[in-house]
Regions:
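Cleft-lining beta-strand/loop regions that shape enzyme active-site pockets
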Residues: 55-135, 142
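Glycine-rich, charged/polar anion/phosphate-binding loops
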Residues: 53-56, 159
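Conserved active-site and cofactor/substrate-binding residues in soluble primary-metabolism enzymes
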Residues: 4, 8, 84, 122, ...
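Intrinsically disordered, low-complexity segments enriched in small/flexible residues
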Residues: 1-51, 59
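Short, exposed beta-strand "edge-strand" segments with a Pro/Gly-rich flavor and a Y/T-containing core
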Residues: 1-7, 78-80, 189-190
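Charged, low-complexity, helix/coiled-coil-prone segments
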Residues: 21-43, 63-78, 98-105, 134-147, ...
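Conserved catalytic cores of soluble enzyme domains
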Residues: 107-197
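N-terminal-biased segments
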Residues: 38-48, 87-88, 107-112, 156
Length: 198
């Protein structure tokens, strides 16, 4: 149909892989953040999605060929990147490096999770360091940009893939279109921040 469609990690796993074994599900990765309403927002996201966090990672296979797969969930707090997301992605890259496997990351994010402040921004450097170690080991990293891929995710690991592909007309950018229009006091083109124009 030449257009993107937002999918959950489970949906994406079912169409992308023959086998999938999820990692880091039993880990008690919790963050203590004193931001008003944050606990309630996380609880609601868990109830709505049936997921613990905004990323699912694990070992996948296509035609018996293994690779590490990480899929961000746009339905869990808009796929925002906090400390748990950063830790799971970092561990995924480290495990891929240790096992000498390629990794595919399907990005979908509104950016850094504002409720976690500077700790969410630190995940950009943390994940990027793990990406670099994987790269220096001579291993393949493929990024699949899905709708939306914005903010700190775009500014870090989303654009570090050896191969970067995108869903048609997916929103890809750093700051949101409205923020840029308000700052520049100009109307931007309709196709601004579509994958085809990035």
């Amino acid at each position: 149909c030449d257009y993107h469609f937002r999918l959950t990690p489970k949906q994406r796993i079912s169409i992308m892989t023959d086998e999938f074994e999820e990692w880091f599900v039993d880990e008690q990765m919790k963050v203590a953040v004193d931001f008003p309403g944050y606990d309630l927002k996380q609880k609601k996201a868990r109830q709505t999605t049936g997921e613990e966090e905004a990323v699912t990672v694990g070992l996948a296979k296509i035609n018996h060929l293994p690779f590490v797969l990480a899929i961000m969930n746009p339905y869990f707090m808009m796929g925002s990147m906090g400390q748990v997301v950063g830790e799971k992605l970092t561990l995924a890259f480290e495990e891929a490096t240790k096992r000498k496997l390629p990794i595919i990351v399907c990005t979908a994010s509104g950016g850094a999770r504002m409720q976690e402040g500077i700790y969410s921004l630190m995940q950009m450097a943390k994940i990027s360091a793990a990406v670099q170690a994987h790269h220096l080991a001579g291993l393949l990293y493929i990024t699949v940009l899905t709708d939306p891929t914005t903010g700190g995710v775009t500014a870090s690991f989303a654009m570090q893939g050896d191969i970067i592909i995108s869903e048609p007309k997916a929103i890809v950018g750093f700051a949101g279109k409205r923020v840029i229009e308000q700052t520049m006091k100009e109307k931007l083109p309709d196709d601004f921040q579509q994958a085809e124009t990035v």
